[in-house]
Amino acid sequence: MSDFSKGSGGIFGLGLGIPQTEKTNDFTGLGSLFESLSESVRRRSSWNDRFTHWEKAESTTETIAIERGRSVVQGILEANQGLRSEGVRFVPQGSFTNRTNVRNEADIDLRVQHPLLRIEHEAGVDPASANNAYGYYDVGRTYTQIAGDMRATIAAELKSSLGKSNIDDSGKKAIRVKGVAGSRGEVDVVSCFTLHHIFIPQGAYQYDRIEGVAILGLDGSWTLNYPDQHIANGRLKRTTTNHQFKRIVRIVKRMQSDMIEHGVITERVPSFLVECLIYLVEDHHFVMNEDRYDRVKRVLNRSLEIISQPRLNLNYYPEINGIKPLFGVKQAWTVEKAHWFLASAIRHLGEC
């Protein structure tokens, strides 16, 4: 293995047990934003009617139509001898796989994962010792060479089978496929390596590791993700909140489009961030005996309160995977952006 690198990221918990305040404080300095909360664009009954629709996942028929695109793309790539010889595996991922996608937004992701390892060492881990313990070795090829070959093969195979006009390979990370007959939406194909994150568990004296994926962008930057842990923790949260977690995620994602239509916001925040902000909220807030309007508002208020704690140690709050810090230095968003979005959503709901 070449270019072993020492990572600075840590292992984090699930963000539970955060103390709740007993009175309302202006944590964010956005007090003036809430002065206009006396009015809402809808009545409570209208909000509840919309939330009843927005919380639903797509129908079985819609699911089949969406998944057809991914199945076609995967079938094309699985038949490629070059990819087979590299030992890649094909794994679905993204909001559709997590069951947090909203209806009429049908994009679906397919991960093409190479077995070559990208090693990240947590602070305090001796790379040479850890690599020796796990038997890691250099394969003689660079990440750039393999990533370039894999991406070129994927793009060429898809263009040959589906037509050049249906393939957009200009993205930094993903190759986008559109126009699959009989399918709805588009398919994003992401090629990546297998990630091993090496760390020493608290109180232990030997190494442990977590597996994820490492994406090498066209600009040479690395993106490290943990999709399997994300799926597992999301499913657990769904169970412990009596199915309310994913319903509220869908509602808030749809609310973002509604907020743009009403001029409350002019730009979107990533759907992934929305999902993580809802995940931070303790389970009992999802299962109160109240209508949908109050439940959504309760969860949004609590999420804003959580990320607005005085002297906040932002590294305490992880993504849903429980590993990466939600507000790490390399994220595409900031805690200020999260404040702004949550406050805007609460403002949009108004007082009914």
Label the model's feature ranges.
Residues M1-F34, R42-F51, V249-H284, Y293-V299, ...:
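Long, low-complexity, intrinsically disordered N-terminal extensions of eukaryotic proteins, enriched
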Residues M1-V91, S95-E105, L116-Y137, N321-K324:
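N-terminal regions immediately upstream of nucleotidyltransferase
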Residues E86-R89, K173, V187, N313-Y316:
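Residue-level recognition of the N-termini of beta-strands and the immediately preceding loop/turn
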Residues L110-R118, G124, R141-R151:
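Internal, well-ordered alpha/beta segment that forms a basic, Gly-enriched binding/recognition surface
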Residues R89, S95-P115, R176-V190:
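Histidine-centered divalent-metal-coordination microenvironment in nucleic-acid enzymes
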Residues E67, S71-Q74, G140-D291, R295-Q309, ...:
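Catalytic cores of NTP-dependent nucleotidyl/adenyl transfer enzymes across multiple folds
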Residues I306-C352:
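Histidine-centered catalytic/metal-binding microenvironments
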